């Protein structure tokens, strides 16, 4: 199989995943589409000119770097919202269980939005995108041990965020 056909298969396999990865960071469909396109363009050029050992990790690393560059250029920091993710609903649940489940999911979304960026990124890569520790270490450019610690701390922080009681009293 030639490089063009192989890369076309890689594109088809990862375009939606890379888009979601970027969208969760920029919270804009238009910007996410542009950065996704730019990611695949850069990876294609690198793919033509050199051997890439782990193409999946290289794709995510490139997407992460382009997202970081985007925020540097705009000189603003925006926390990506997870509220636009489609709800996860089990049709077998009764209405009361569905309400409780949705409330929990909303707490998790809010908790994730309140985490620092590297914690949020580690949790998303591990539990939403399904990456291994090794793959996350390549994407985030840290050792596997550091990633394990980061994920542990991120989960502890997320647990604290989700357990916070919302204050509805007026200040």
Q: How would you label these PLM feature ranges?
A:
Residues 22, 72, 115, 155-171:
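Short, Lys/Arg-enriched C-terminal cap helix and immediately downstream tail that follows
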Residues 64-82, 101:
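Arg/Lys-rich amphipathic alpha helix in sigma70-family domain 2
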Residues 122-126:
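A short pre-motif secondary-structure segment
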């Amino acid at each position: 199989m030639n490089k063009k056909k192989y890369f076309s298969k890689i594109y088809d396999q990862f375009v939606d995943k890379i888009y979601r990865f970027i969208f969760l960071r920029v919270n804009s469909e238009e910007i996410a589409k542009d950065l996704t396109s730019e990611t695949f363009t850069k990876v294609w050029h690198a793919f033509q000119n050199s051997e890439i050992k782990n193409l999946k990790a290289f794709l995510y690393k490139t997407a992460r770097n382009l997202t970081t560059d985007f925020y540097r250029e705009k000189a603003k920091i925006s926390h990506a919202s997870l509220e636009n993710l489609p709800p996860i609903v089990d049709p077998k649940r009764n209405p009361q269980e569905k309400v409780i489940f949705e409330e929990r999911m909303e707490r998790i979304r809010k908790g994730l939005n309140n985490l620092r960026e590297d914690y949020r990124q580690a949790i998303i890569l591990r539990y939403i995108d399904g990456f291994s520790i090794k793959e996350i270490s390549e994407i985030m450019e840290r050792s596997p041990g550091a990633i394990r610690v980061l994920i542990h701390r991120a989960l502890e922080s997320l647990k604290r965020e989700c357990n916070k009681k919302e204050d509805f009293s007026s200040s």
